[in-house]
Amino acid sequence: MPVVHANGVDIHYRISGDGDETVVLINGVGDDLEGWAMQIDPLVAAGLRVITFDNRGVGRSSLPPGPYSSREMAADTKALADTLALSRFHLVGVSLGGLIAQEYALSHPGDLRSVVLANTYAKPDAYTRAAFEVWGQIAEAGGMPLMMRQQAPWVFSPAFYAAHPERLTAILGEMERSAQPAWSFAAQIAALLTHDCTDRLGSLNTPALVIAADDDIIIRLSLSHRMFEELPRASWAIVPGGHAAFVENPDPWNRAVIAFIDQHRAAVH
């Protein structure tokens, strides 16, 4: 798969589809580009070219020393976009990816037609901060296999546990197989802890969709809604599921994203 050298790191990426407009998907903490498996085909079927990539610190991208920041990771995304000559594209970020997408939209609004901020926040509150701090501590003290097993009840809903035990087992197996080193996971956690766009949200004028999940316990609906209220051109959507709603309930999540992007395609304006 292709790799570009961008912003001082090697970024592993994949292009799917050949639509006349492009959407770039940004992963959450610890996820590589395979995490978007449930989104690729629906987005391609909607006429989009889809670009996925591994953030610094995970997958086949470089693993530079940490800690990382959301602003630094947004610069990685910008360097990738410039290398691929992207312009006027749609940007989608989930969790940590949503923090990165905020920084991108604030720094490079002219690049974007729209931005989707899913299961994310403008600044962590005390509860979310404490949870992410523990994730980093578990990874460094007990290793990534333990971290992946511990993480699951935080990111998947009780309903998903009850209805899809075999699928959950397969997902956990894949998470453990693809896990990054504990130190680079902790480096990504640092970006979650230090992110703060609260004083700048009012200047984010790119059309935005904020998605929250009704059973997300780590980035609660109320925390995402707090961000939504500060955005001048934002829409709001609630989908069923936990923090990983895009994995456990991909259909409503995908429909919300595609419907929003359709409103902001070039042909509409």
Over which residues does each language-model region extend?
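Active-site loop/oxyanion-hole signature of alpha/beta-hydrolase fold enzymes
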Residues: 51-52, 56-92
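Flexible "cap/lid" loop of the alpha/beta hydrolase fold
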Residues: 102, 106-107, 113-142
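Acidic catalytic loop of the alpha/beta-hydrolase fold
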Residues: 215-219
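Conserved alpha/beta-hydrolase catalytic His-Asp/Glu region
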Residues: 126-128, 145-200
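Gly/Ala-rich beta-loop-alpha elbow adjacent to hydrolase catalytic centers
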Residues: 93, 97, 101
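Conserved HGGG/HGGXW glycine-rich cap/lid loop of the alpha/beta-hydrolase fold
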Residues: 9-62
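Short beta-strand/loop motif that positions the catalytic acidic residue
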Residues: 204, 210-212
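Catalytic active-site module of serine/aspartate enzymes centered on a nucleophile-bearing elbow/loop
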Residues: 234-269
